[in-house]
């Protein structure tokens, strides 16, 4: 009976995972492009929409590289087409409209992940050019209403490229944006190395280390840094002001672990493996309180300050594997 329950849960979860992205091209291959022109796919090709990439780059698309790599590649081909039709990769498209929803530029993660795993059935050079476009700051040539531009091409990307970090007095959610940019830039660096673009590989490898800028050893948290190079004060790791503070749908407790591309570097910042493990343990035993007048409702499923109910925490339990105590991951 227990095995049947586990099986039922697994396949129910798998069904839910495959609900989106969804088919957007008709039976004859016609679809509405990101430029709102009627287009037609190549014969046998399908065009997809509803890429909620802030959600799906973490687990869905890596799962598809294992279970259905060709489907994942077809979705990447749709993303490449969207970048050509609309001028830039979407962060989250809806029926061939840019929404500008959430942060990061995670289409590049899909491309790098698939390419690294040997899936080559897409034009990687087109995908790479689109990745460089997404990581820079250029508001021209994007086919969306003018009021949408700051969401599709946020000013945070300007600061990252111009001064090397996102000042918390210049942009909201600065820490979260910068940490996700560092990961995405690491993905771009991988592609650059693969394609022989040494100059950009070095440039984006340097950007990928940008997470170090935000770590405050005196508190043990990633913190907002203003344009004068000073930590934001006052600081409260339990505080949350939904979509209006230095983090995105989370607080300093949850976001201080978002360095998925360099866990060894994060351990070094936190004082080595033993201190890292103790610090990680403290996340799960901390007081689960949240403070503030506009606490993010997305911070949910709390075990201590680990928020299993929302995306920024989803990778954290796996960090024990990198710290040499994999049984802690299994226990959790």
Regions found by a protein language model. Name each.
Residues 2-6:
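Short, small-residue-biased leader/transition segments that mark boundaries at the very start
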Residues 7, 17, 22, 32-48, ...:
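Fold-level signature of zinc-dependent metallopeptidase catalytic domains
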Residues 7-27, 66-79, 104-139, 212:
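Carboxylate/His-rich catalytic cores and anion/metal-binding grooves
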Residues 28-43, 69-94, 288-295:
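Active-site-surrounding "flap" and adjacent substrate/cofactor-binding loops of secreted or lumenal enzymes
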Residues 39-50, 89-107:
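Aromatic/His-enriched, Gly/Pro-containing loop or helix-boundary segments
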Residues 43-58, 66-67, 108, 118-332:
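Active-site core of glycosidic bond-cleaving carbohydrate-active enzymes
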Residues 52-56, 62-75, 82-88, 101-104, ...:
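Structured, non-membrane catalytic/scaffold regions adjacent to prosthetic-group chemistry
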């Amino acid at each position: 009976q227990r095995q049947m329950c586990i099986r039922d849960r697994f396949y129910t979860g798998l069904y839910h995972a495959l609900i989106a992205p969804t088919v957007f091209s008709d039976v004859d291959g016609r679809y509405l492009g990101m430029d709102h022109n009627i287009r037609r796919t190549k014969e046998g090709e399908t065009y997809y929409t509803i890429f909620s990439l802030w959600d799906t780059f973490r687990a869905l698309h890596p799962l598809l590289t294992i279970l259905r790599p060709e489907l994942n590649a077809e979705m990447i081909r749709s993303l490449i087409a969207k970048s050509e039709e609309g001028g830039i990769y979407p962060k989250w498209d809806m029926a061939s409209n840019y929404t500008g929803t959430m942060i990061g530029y995670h289409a590049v993660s899909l491309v790098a992940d698939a390419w690294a795993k040997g899936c080559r059935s897409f034009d990687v050079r087109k995908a790479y050019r689109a990745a460089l476009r997404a990581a820079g700051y250029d508001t021209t040539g994007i086919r969306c209403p003018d009021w949408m531009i700051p969401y599709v091409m946020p000013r945070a990307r300007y600061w990252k490229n111009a001064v090397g970090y996102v000042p918390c007095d210049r942009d909201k959610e600065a820490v979260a944006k910068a940490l996700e940019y560092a990961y995405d830039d690491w993905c771009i660096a991988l592609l650059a190395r693969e394609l022989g673009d040494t100059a950009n590989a070095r440039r984006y490898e340097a950007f990928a280390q940008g997470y170090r800028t935000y770590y405050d050893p005196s508190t043990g948290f990633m913190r907002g840094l203003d344009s004068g190079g000073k930590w934001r004060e006052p600081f409260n790791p339990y505080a949350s002001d939904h979509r209006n503070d230095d983090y995105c749908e989370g607080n300093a407790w949850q976001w201080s672990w978002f360095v998925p591309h360099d866990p060894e570097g994060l351990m070094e910042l936190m004082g080595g493996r033993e201190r890292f493990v103790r610090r990680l343990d403290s996340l799960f035993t901390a007081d689960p309180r949240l403070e503030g007048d506009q606490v993010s409702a997305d911070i949910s499923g709390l075990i201590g300050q680990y928020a299993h109910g929302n995306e920024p925490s989803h990778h954290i339990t796996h960090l024990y594997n990198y710290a040499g105590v994999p049984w802690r991951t299994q226990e959790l």
